[in-house]
């Protein structure tokens, strides 16, 4: 059975959460492509999201470290001539390099899937993914200044 990590990003809070996807839940995601949007209730065993939320797949990585590329169809692995992202960041304009990349379809060879949370249109509450235990940067700086003044 396939197992991979799902990195779920929240665009409103700017935070992300890494989730372990195993067995039956992972099997449901196999065959989806970059850009596909699915109902969050599909992975309700892993993360509890309110009704109406959707998840959009934005990319991923294979077991060999090769990134998924939206321009390559299917669950394949091949060498391609890249001039930019994803998979290559040129240092000079016009630079091209042949790199190993994966296709745009999730398969059992994928170890990490990147995704973004899509909010319902009428959602006006706080962000869903929040990292607890973090102090706000302004509060932390104020505490440091108070300690330094003493």
From Swiss-Prot:
UniProt GO MF annotations: structural constituent of ribosome
Any one annotated GO CC term: ribonucleoprotein complex
PROSITE patterns linked: RIBOSOMAL_S6E (PS00578)
Keywords from the named record: Ribonucleoprotein, Ribosomal protein
Signal peptide as annotated in the record: none
Xref: Pfam families: Ribosomal_S6e (PF01092)
The family this protein is said to belong to: Belongs to the eukaryotic ribosomal protein eS6 family.
NCBIfam families (UniProt xref): PRK04290.1-2
Protein name as annotated: Small ribosomal subunit protein eS6
Gene expressing this chain: rps6e
């Amino acid at each position: 059975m396939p197992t991979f990590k799902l990195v779920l990003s929240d665009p409103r809070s700017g935070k992300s959460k890494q989730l372990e996807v195993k067995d039956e839940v992972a099997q449901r995601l196999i065959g989806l492509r970059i850009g596909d949007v699915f109902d969050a209730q599909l992975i309700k065993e892993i993360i509890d999201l309110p009704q109406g939320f959707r998840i959009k797949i934005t990319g991923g990585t294979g077991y060999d470290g090769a990134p998924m590329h939206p321009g390559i169809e299917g669950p394949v692995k091949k060498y391609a001539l890249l001039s930019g992202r994803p998979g290559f960041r040129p240092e000079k304009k016009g630079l091209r390099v042949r790199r190993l990349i994966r296709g745009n379809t999730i398969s059992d060879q994928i170890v990490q899937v990147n995704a973004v949370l899509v909010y319902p249109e009428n959602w006006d509450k706080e962000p869903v993914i929040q990292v607890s235990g973090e102090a706000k940067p302004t509060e932390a700086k104020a505490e440091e200044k108070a300690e330094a003044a003493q």
